[in-house]
Every structure is written in structure tokens, then in C-alpha cells.
Amino acid sequence: MKQYLDLLNRILTEGVHKEDRTGTGTISVFGHQMRFNLEEGFPLVTTKKLHLKSIIHELLWFLQGDTNVKYLQDNGVRIWNEWADANGDLGHIYGYQWRSWPDYNGGFIDQISEAIETIKHNPDSRRIIVSAWNVADLNNMNLPPCHAFFQFYVANGRLSLQLYQRSADTFLGVPFNIASYALLLQMVAQVTGLQTGDFVHTLGDTHIYTNHLEQVKLQLSREPRPLPQMKINPDIKDIFSFKYEDFELVNYDPWPHIAGKVSV
């Protein structure tokens, strides 16, 4: 994935040193965009092995509107543990906002269902947006959303998705985010009867933590390998009916995993 490696190189070349909330420190650039044509393969980084199980289970967890880590932990996924309270709760994070955004009449808005219906019945709409950035609810989230909102776009029978990510941990987080939203795009395309188009990833504060610099340099020394393909059970026609077993990654031949400490 040349786009991703180019981003790492840009940060190392142009980035400025900044202090951050975690106290770790970063090298950062502001504003970057990557585009992935999913017909060319599933955009899963090959210069280090990624834990696809975590990516799939997290996305299914979001789509169910769940905000407690029990489901993740039951499936061997620990990526949210650092932010959970003693009961495993994370507050009104992604899943809550996607499926239960509070309205002003005491009810809730299921943004995912509304987006699906709009794609089916009004595909030329410029309002097919799902937002996790609920300003009135930020204080009720254990971690405010980094990938803040996304928009669908339909043209010539192809569905594309653009994500705006306000804060991008380029070594640890961004490879997960690319794969997660590319998978979401494939799933929505299937349930709406469209072909898969482009995933466009727009980044705000785009950074490498200073304790990841050696890992990044190691990753940049590795030659990218051909992208894998993601096969999805074609019988699933409802976005909320997908299970982990409905996904099969084929021809993934990554370099070995590179460990890095998450900054909390």
C-alpha cells in the first residue's frame, strides 16, 4: 500500500514536533488524503501483519450499537480495554451515535439505517452522512471519536465512502481504520445492490508518536506485497445480520507483526 507508506514518509519529512494529551509527544502534519480503489484489492497493510479479527469484531460491535467491551473481550479483542470503566462501559461512543443519536423530541435516530435507506431510494443525495461527533455528548464519551464522520456517494452503480478522521495515530490506528471503513463500504455496497467504489480517507492531525519512530522506519524498509481480497457471504442482505464467519480474507501475505505501545 504505497499510499500509506507515502504518508509515513511525509510525516517524517515534513512533520513538526507537538505535545499531546497523552504526554508521549508526536511528529505531526495537518491535512492528508488517501484514495483506495477496492477493485484493486482489499487495503490491508502488508508491511506488517494486522490482527484482522479485531478489525472485523470491532466493526460488527459498532454496527450493533454496543458500547460495552464484553462482546469484544468474549471474542479475544482487547483494543478498547484501556478506555473502559470498571463495568466495561465506554459511554456514548461510536456505536451509540451511529445507531441511537438523540433527537430533540426524546427519541433516537438510527443513522446507519437511514443511510442505507437513502442509498437505496435517493442515491444522488448529498446528505448520506453518518456522524459520531456529537458535540453535546462529548463529555459522555470515554474517548471522543477520532474517525468523526463519513459520507457515501453513488455514481455509475458504484458506492464510494469518504471518512474524515480528526486525529490519526498513523502507526497503530490508521491501518485499522483503513481496513475497517473499506470493509464497511463492501458490506453496505452488498446490501444496497451496488458495486464497490473508492474508499477516500481524509485525515486532520496526522501524527506518528515519538515512541513509534523506530517501528515506522522498520516498516518503511519493507517492500509492499500484493493486496489480499476480502470475500463476503453473498447471502447477507441486511447490514445488521453479518457475523464474523461471513468474512474470508484470501491471499494475505504480510511481513511480520511490529509491536507498538498505545498512548492513552
Swiss-Prot record:
Disulfide bonds: none
Listed InterPro entries: Thymidate_synth/dCMP_Mease, Thymidate_synth/dCMP_Mease_dom, Thymidate_synth/dCMP_Mease_sf, Thymidylate_synthase, Thymidylate_synthase_AS
Record's catalysed reaction(s): dUMP + (6R)-5,10-methylene-5,6,7,8-tetrahydrofolate = 7,8-dihydrofolate + dTMP
Enzyme Commission no: 2.1.1.45
Pathway(s) this gene product operates in, as recorded in its UniProt entry: Pyrimidine metabolism; dTTP biosynthesis
Keyword Phosphoprotein: no
Any one GO CC term of the record: cytosol
GO MF, one example: thymidylate synthase activity
Subunit and interaction comment: Homodimer.
Name the record gives this protein: Thymidylate synthase
Classification of source organism: Bacteria, Pseudomonadati, Bacteroidota, Bacteroidia, Bacteroidales
Encoding gene per record: thyA
